[in-house]
C-alpha cells in the first residue's frame, strides 16, 4: 500500500483504531503525522491521541502485531485518566514535577498499586507515541516509580474454595454461566480468554482447548477436565462460532459477580477462578511445575503463591500443638 502524500486531508480529523488505523499513521508523511499529533496534544483531542497511541503500540511495542487484546483495551482508560488530570497541563511541555504529582494524587485517592501501574503504563505509551510522531521530546514518566504494595501477593486476591465453586455451579441455571465458571475454575482461563474461546479451538477427542487470546500474545493448549467436557457437550452452538455469548471481559466479570450474589458467595472477581484452578491443582498434585504448566506461568515464583494459599498442612500441624 503506498504512502499517503504530504498535505493529504483524507485522514483528518480522525484516523480510527485497529490495524487499519495503525497502518494509516505509519503510511502518513512524517510532517503530517507530526502536525496532527501536535494539534491533538494541544487540543487534548482524546480520539486522535488514543488512535496515535494504539498505532505506536501495534507498530513499535515489544509485542508488535501480537500485542495482547487486553493491553489495547486497557490503555485508553489510562490515557483518558491522564488527560482529565492534566486538563491545565501542556501535554507537549509538561511541568517537570507533573508526573510525580499525578502519581501522588492517585495514591491519595487510595488506588491500588496495580491500578496506578496500569495508568502509568498508558501514560508512557502516550508519550512514546508523541515522541515517535516528533510532536514532543519530553518523557515525563521516565523516572516515575510506582509505590510498592507491602501486601503479600497471596493476600490480595484469594481463590474461591471448593465449596464456593460448588455453590456457584449449583446456582448457574444458564449453561453458558456454568461453562464460564468451569473454564476459570478448572481450565484456569482468564476472563479475556474465556470470551474469545471459539469452537474451532475445542478438541473433544484430545480433551483440550487451544487458547489464542492469551496474555502476552502466546498461544497455549489447556487440558479439559471431565466437568468442562460434559458442560461443553451440552452447550448450544452459537452462529458466530464463539463458545460464550459474552463479548467483553467486563461482561464475564459481571456474570460471575451476579452468580456470587445468587449463591451467597463473597465476590472475589473473575480472576480468582483462575487462582482456584491453581490452588486445587497444586493441592492435589503437590507439583509446582505441573501447576505452572497448566496455567502457563513463565516463572515458578508466580506459581508459589498457590502453595501459600494451600495451607492445609500448616493448619494441621498447628492444630496438634
Task: Tell where the protein language model's regions lie, with residue ranges.
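C-terminal catalytic core of tyrosine-transesterase DNA break-rejoin enzymes
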Residues: 182, 186, 276-298, 305, ...
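Conserved tyrosine-mediated DNA breakage-rejoining catalytic core shared by Y-recombinases
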Residues: 187, 196-231, 301
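N-terminal core-binding DNA-recognition domain of tyrosine recombinases/integrases
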Residues: 54-70, 76-155, 235
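Catalytic-site neighborhood detector that most strongly recognizes the C-terminal catalytic loop/helix
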Residues: 213-216, 295-320
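Short basic/aromatic active-site micro-motif
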Residues: 249, 266-285
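Active-site/catalytic core of tyrosine-dependent DNA strand-transfer enzymes
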Residues: 225-266
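DNA breakage-rejoining catalytic core of tyrosine-based enzymes
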Residues: 136-138, 150-167, 216-226, 238-243
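Basic, Lys/Arg- and aromatic-enriched nucleic-acid-binding interface segment
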Residues: 148, 152-153, 162-191, 195
